[in-house]
Amino acid sequence: MPAVLLVLYVNPPPSVCILTQKLSLGLYNQWWRVCRSVPPPWYVFFNKRSMSTFKLMMDGRLVFAMAIAILSVVLSCGTCEKAKRAVRGRQDRPKEFPPPRYNYTILTRYNATALASPFINDQVKNVDLRIVTATRPCEMIALIAKTNIDSILKELAAAQKTYSARLTWFKIMPTCATPIHDVSYMKCNPKLSFAMCDERSDILWQASLITMAAETDDELGLVLAAPAHSASGLYRRVIEIDGRRIYTDFSVTIPSERCPIAFEQNFGNPDRCKTPEQYSRGEVFTRRFLGEFNFPQGEHMTWLKFWFVYDGGNLPVQFYEAQAFARPVPPDNHPGFDSVESEITQNKTDPKPGQADPKPNQPFKWPSIKHLAPRLDEVDEVIEPVTKPPKTSKSNSTFVGISVGLGIAGLVLVGVILYVCLRRKKELKKSAQNGLTRLRSTFKDVKYTQLP
């Protein structure tokens, strides 16, 4: 039994959080059968003629009850953060929420539109690629990149017409793409900022990302709080404005060190990860596998930061735009006007006798566009940087030390109790075999006098 408790303490399953009290009660009842020769606890407190508290502790009942209580507290407080995080919103709330950017009406019918394919068929299309690298585990990162949306909105404003838009984030996998966030906008005024529209659809999120992801203030970027290593890879943002699409790729790298407050993600689930053929046939409806989370952007971001700090994370001072992919610069000897002019000069001057002709400049081979913007076949090949070990928090280390100490103390107490109870039972059995009956010394304190 102590070994089982030790395993549950080191690596408990999610059900431990709910069944901790029942487990403690069950162990208590099972051990009561071994130590049933000892009076129950309430006999001590309600019967003045009971045996002393010291004798009760030696028999093991009170000590065992204290050990079970200590182990229950350790199991429920030290190992159930993930389960408590899902329901703590009802218990803890941020003090203030920012006002919404604008007022809008949510209409569910906009979610009935099939999702366009995130895959790019044009092999020469230039896609903006950004690099996002987390320097340590349990870090909050942002996927931010400026676009040419303002020029499109100016054209629409000059034409004096409203527009409709759709913003979707995808996690690109080797053979499929998983939508993780989707929202549609209708009746938008081009004179205002993007997404400030009168109507919009339900705000859809992948359920496992609600407590670890949120939109930036302009609703164009994505903030990830303490992402796990499984969140590494390629993310693609698709902005569609009146049929025109803008693609932006983010190559995200997360350290392989384990983060205790991170949630592992399964982006390759076939129920959500759709193939290019399914997108082309118009079979992808995000309403079927994404969950609603109709909180305004400011309120959602406030919740995200609150949960992150509650779990022990450190908020960044400011979110910066992701670094653009450094495109290669052509070398000095690439074919151009200078090389053509030098060739003409060389043709006019004859080389000296006995001197070999100089070797012509090798033409520069431009890299394939596939290396500038990773495509479907190599989206998850992310180079992991060499990171320093994460800084350990004093509060976390202190709590872990106290928890381990309490657990060891509880196990020692359980072992002592088991030894005392088994020895007592053995003595009673031996006395019964010898024909001796153990009598309770109820009157052991009565003074005896010799009769005349």
From Swiss-Prot:
Disulfide bonds join 138-259, 176-273, 188-197. Residues 331-365 are annotated as: Disordered. Keywords: Disulfide bond, Glycoprotein, Host-virus interaction, Membrane, Signal, Transmembrane, Transmembrane helix, Viral attachment to host cell, Viral attachment to host entry receptor, Viral envelope protein, Virion, Virus entry into host cell. Belongs to the herpesviridae glycoprotein D family. One of its GO terms (cellular component) is viral envelope. It comes from Equine herpesvirus 1 (strain Ab4p). Residues 1-19 form the signal peptide. It is a single-pass type I membrane protein. Residues 423-452 are intravirion. Envelope glycoprotein that binds to host cell entry receptors, promoting the virus entry into host cells. May trigger fusion with host membrane, by recruiting the fusion machinery composed of gB and gH/gL. It is found in: Virion membrane. The chain crosses the membrane at residues 406-422. InterPro entries: Herpes_glycop_dom (IPR002896), Ig-like_dom_sf (IPR036179). Pfam families: Herpes_glycop_D. Glycans are attached at residues 103, 111, 347, 396. This is Envelope glycoprotein D. Residues 20-405 are virion surface. GO terms for biological process: entry receptor-mediated virion attachment to host cell; symbiont entry into host cell. Its main location: virion.
